Amino acid sequence: SYAHALRYIAQFVPLYLATSLSMQQARRKLGKALFSLFEGGVFADGGLLVYAGQNRCMPVELLLDINEESAKITAHSYEGQVYKYSMLVYDKEERINILSRLKEKPYQVFYKPPLITVIHKDVDKRKGVLHICKALAFPLDQVLVVGNSLKDWEMMSVVSHSCAVMNAEPLLKERARYTLNPDRLAAFFRFRE
């Protein structure tokens, strides 16, 4: 399983998570035991970076003109700064209305009905990975980035070692240098000893 794979890899190299989830969502999804294997990460597509006891939060302006009766809004924050908004909007007309108003703002907006997500306009996973690698002096030719979605390719392509998980989108598996098979992990990761 991937949980066993992560536990195994964490014995040899530092792990960092890169996800579109907020840090709180990632902690809930992975569970405390798995989340604690990561030394930090890129959260909310780069809205929050956590590494080596430091953080960089890219705040998002307050959403003032959204009717909270028509949208369930969750503000994801770190030390009092909101770095991601998630909105569940079930009414199609209201979604269209909200999306048109958000396009006028300096945000990145992601939309997958009924969910609308808002983050800072200047962040992404690629920039987050590059920032952490530079801050921690990780040579890019010694970094492995694992992804499961074609949206991860931009982040994966900046390092020498890219890896798709077994159930990744087929095009990502074609582009990635490796495919991660958790059943073969012990042989795969011995290069770091």
Please name every model-derived segment.
Residues 2-76:
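Active-site phosphate-binding/coordination module
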Residues 12-13, 38, 45, 82-83, ...:
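Short, well-ordered alpha-helix to beta-strand connector turns
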Residues 16, 42, 144-146, 163, ...:
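Hydrophobic/aromatic beta-strand patches that form the interior of the parallel beta-sheet core
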Residues 23, 151, 170:
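Conserved Rossmann-like nucleotide-cofactor binding loop
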Residues 26-30, 98, 155, 172:
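Hydrophobic packing residues within well-ordered alpha-helices of enzyme cores
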Residues 67-158, 167:
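Conserved acidic, metal-coordinating active-site core of Asp-based
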Residues 158, 162-193:
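Asp-based, Mg2+/Mn2+-dependent phosphohydrolase catalytic module
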